[in-house]
Amino acid sequence: MKFVLVLFILILYIKPTKANEKDHELLMATLFVQSSAEFYANSKSLYSSAQQNLLDVLENKNHTAALEQMGNFQDKPPAIILDVDQTVLDNSAYQARLIKNNSSYPNGWVSWAKEEKAEFLPGALEFIKFAQSKGVEIFFVTNRVIEIENATLSNYEKLGLKLSSRVDHILSRGENGWDSNKTSRRELVAKDYRILMMFGDNLGDFVDIKDNLLTPQKRVEITKNMMIFGVFLGLCFQTQCMEHGRELLSILIIQFLEIKN
């Protein structure tokens, strides 16, 4: 019932008004993210739910959230993988800038990231710090380009998140030859860590991106064993519509109904 409510709220907020030359496709969704109590409460609730489940999956040595996790992983140190944009960091201020300038992504994206002004989504920082306090290593698998990796790290530090320098916590697109497919980066983490949870706002944050092209039944099958798959759905409904609008929402509704059925 919770996800149905979230879905309804987003349909309400992104329903188009009468077209005129001043309309901007990002306007309603950006306003929703920046000012809605429902958005705040849902994001907070999603991360709070993950925090409540963390100790259970930490104690269960046979649990892994990653399809890439093979072999004897039970005694590996624990880790969590998170996407960055609109999963951990809120870029609605950048979206608002696009609206003001009557522009579109990727115009100004790198410059925005280098300003290091993004805020954490509600609940994200508290969850990450809680996981760190339990000895869980944090990895950000992102399609931000390597050019802005240091800015991303600095942005985190300004917001109070400290990451040790002994491992590479931010695995960026373009680093070590990585393209936008995140599979090889998840495999890299899985070599040395047991992956407890994964967070993202796109199916490619969890499975090989080419699996997005599979049949609806296959997509359901490959996601059955994903821990905290509800976090994926919730963050999709909250944030992806801000970036991609009504067409993507229709896709997400279909995926939501497939999984529920």
Question: Predicted regions: what is each one?
Answer:
Residues V4-L12:
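Sec-dependent N-terminal signal peptides
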Residues P16-L82, I251-N261:
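Non-catalytic pre-domain segments flanking phosphatase-related domains
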Residues F32-A41, V110-K117, F139-V145, G174-E175:
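Second-shell loop/turn segments in exported
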Residues S48, E149-N261:
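C-terminal cap/substrate-recognition subdomain and adjoining C-terminal extension
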Residues L58-M70, I138-N143, S165-D168:
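Surface-exposed patches in mature extracellular/periplasmic domains of secreted proteins
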Residues P77, V88-E119, S133:
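Active-site neighborhood of HAD-like aspartate-dependent phosphohydrolases
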Residues A79-D83, L89, E137-T142, H169-S172, ...:
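Structural recognition of the beta-strand scaffold that forms the well-ordered cores
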Residues Q86, A124-E157, D201-L203:
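Substrate-recognition element of Asp-dependent hydrolases with the DxDx(T/V) motif
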